[in-house]
Amino acid sequence: MAEKTYPMTLTEKEQLEKELEELKLVRRPEIVERIKIARSYGDLSENSEYDAAKDEQAFVEGQISTLETKIRYAEIIDSDAVAKDEVAIGKTVIVQEVGTTDKDTYHIVGAAGADIFSGKISNESPIAQALIGKKTGDKVRIESPAATYDVEIISVEKTN
């Protein structure tokens, strides 16, 4: 069975690698030290410090595993390989809702780099899926769980 790939820009992959390094070289040793100290308190059956450290260790190891998988199966998307005005991962798109003056700016990223609070939307989101492959001037119907609406693509630029 083929493994799932994780489309992302080179910058996104580098950010994941940096996060992985932080977890392995800083967080993991800190937690091991906390576990060692908590063990020194004696009876582990009622040792909340030990339980908390073990829970954090499990969480961090899960994060490490997830990041390693995403990095291993990263599919680097070169936004320069698509037309300059075509929406793709690694591009910033400004859309205007048809019939209004409302404009929204989206940075299309791989799922691993999504951060809605900074305008970075996953290529797997309904908005991005509707926009990817379209060009400046195209009118697009976006169907999201919250609403269905039409937008016009005002501009498409490579994200820095």
Swiss-Prot record:
PROSITE patterns the UniProt entry points to: GREAB_1, GREAB_2
Protein's UniProt keywords contain Repeat: no
Entry coiled-coil feature ranges: 1-71
Pfam assignment, any one: GreA_GreB
GO biological process: DNA-templated transcription elongation; regulation of DNA-templated transcription elongation
Lineage, highest ranks first: Bacteria, Bacillati, Bacillota, Bacilli, Lactobacillales
Homology family: Belongs to the GreA/GreB family.
Keyword list, A-Z: Coiled coil, DNA-binding, Transcription, Transcription regulation
Record's function text: Necessary for efficient RNA polymerase transcription elongation past template-encoded arresting sites. The arresting sites in DNA have the property of trapping a certain fraction of elongating RNA polymerases that pass through, resulting in locked ternary complexes. Cleavage of the nascent transcript by cleavage factors such as GreA or GreB allows the resumption of elongation from the new 3'terminus. GreA releases sequences of 2 to 3 nucleotides.
InterPro entries the UniProt entry points to: GreA/GreB_C_sf, TF_GreA/GreB_CS, Tscrpt_elong_fac_GreA, Tscrpt_elong_fac_GreA/B, Tscrpt_elong_fac_GreA/B_C, Tscrpt_elong_fac_GreA/B_fam, Tscrpt_elong_fac_GreA/B_N, Tscrpt_elong_fac_GreA/B_N_sf
GO molecular function, one term: RNA polymerase binding
Domain of life: Bacteria
Organism, as annotated: Streptococcus pyogenes serotype M1
Protein's name in the database: Transcription elongation factor GreA
